């Protein structure tokens, strides 16, 4: 399955700073996403909505494949077995073979920055 409209960054080429800063708030528009790496190297994807920000690790809970955001369907989809997760419902599995939601990454807005919470 080709993921037309999927995020182009596979592993998140932006790392979290030592002070837990992920990205300046102005760099992620409402409705946008931002790909980054956690301090342990795990890939993650941040979402910004009208009401705030949230993020998930993007390693599939089935067999560890990479889940990429498929914007037209508003789902994170694993490239290995097409497991699908709804980022707007706490990373809930909407199509198997995965049976666990994606791990939540706690984030917050602090001043002009999106940070690890």
Locate predicted features.
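N-terminal pre-ligand scaffold of iron-sulfur
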Residues: 3-73, 100-117
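Short cysteine/histidine-rich metal-coordination sites, predominantly Zn2+-binding motifs
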Residues: 74-81, 92-102
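Short, acidic, Ser/Thr-enriched surface-loop or helix-capping motifs
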Residues: 87-88
């Amino acid at each position: 399955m080709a993921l037309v409209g999927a995020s182009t960054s596979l592993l998140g080429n932006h790392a979290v700073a030592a002070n837990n800063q992920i990205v300046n708030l102005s760099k992620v528009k409402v409705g946008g996403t931002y790909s980054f790496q956690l301090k342990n190297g795990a890939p993650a994807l941040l979402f910004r909505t009208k009401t705030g920000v949230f993020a998930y690790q993007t390693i599939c809970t089935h067999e560890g494949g990479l889940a990429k955001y498929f914007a037209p369907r508003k789902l994170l989809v694993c490239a290995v077995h097409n497991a699908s997760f709804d980022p707007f419902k706490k990373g809930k599995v909407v199509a198997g073979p995965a049976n666990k939601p994606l791990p939540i990454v706690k984030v917050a807005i602090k001043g002009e920055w999106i940070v690890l919470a």
